[in-house]
Amino acid sequence: PQTSNKVAAREWKERLRWKGDLRYRHESFDVEDRRDRTRQRIRARAALIADVNENVEVGFGLATGGDDPASTNQSLGDGFSTKAIQLDLAYARWASPIDGFDVIAGKFNNPFLRIGGNGLLWDGDLNPEGLALAFERGAWFGSAVGLWLNEESRDEDSYLVGVQGGLNADLGDAVALTAGIGYFNLLDLEGRPPIFDGDPRGNTLRADGALAYGY
């Protein structure tokens, strides 16, 4: 029995993977008509990923920072106070019998391709929440999502649906082309306060402080 227990423990150990990173950053701001500012920031992330079987993967991760969905940076200072650790990942991923198709549920890494890591649509630190279907086969890729933005007990929930698809083409002589198209629709946001921290982030507000449009 002891031998079988050791074998089982070793098999489980082989199914577990750790990943993480630590970054220290010095920031300096020199803005006209404002006082110069410097600050020290850290970012620490750690995640445990387990292969439950050949088709199912689950992941759990923690990260520094507050509850800002687009940042895991933590400013140092504040009298040596302890710093917050937040839930950054909690998901299950199922590899379907259809080759190249995966289903993901929970709080997961962004499944959409960000060309050059550009943050025009999606911040690099953002881990969305909801359901996703991811596809990758040969040069072709794609994703479809249903993401929950805000849960309301007395009104319709706000959410996002989106699709993206494209292909990666190797043109030879160290030249590659990535082409794709995407569609994203934010639902039940018009007439609601800005989500998360109340900051409209450039969006138009009505006189009562609610969003004038559905984005």
Language model: regions and residue ranges:
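Short intrinsically disordered, low-complexity coil segments enriched in acidic
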Residues: 1-5, 43-47, 143
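N-terminal periplasmic/intermembrane-space "pro-region" immediately following the signal or transit peptide
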Residues: 1-35
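Outer-membrane beta-barrel architecture
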Residues: 8, 21, 45-48, 90-93, ...
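Residues that define the transmembrane beta-barrel architecture of outer-membrane proteins
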Residues: 14, 36-42, 83-88, 125-129, ...
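Outer-envelope exported proteins of Gram-negative bacteria
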Residues: 19-21, 59-61, 65, 104-106, ...
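Surface-exposed loop and membrane-interface regions of Gram-negative outer-membrane beta-barrel proteins
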Residues: 25-43, 50-98, 112-123
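Signature for the C-terminal beta-barrel architecture of outer-membrane proteins
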Residues: 97-103, 111, 118-215
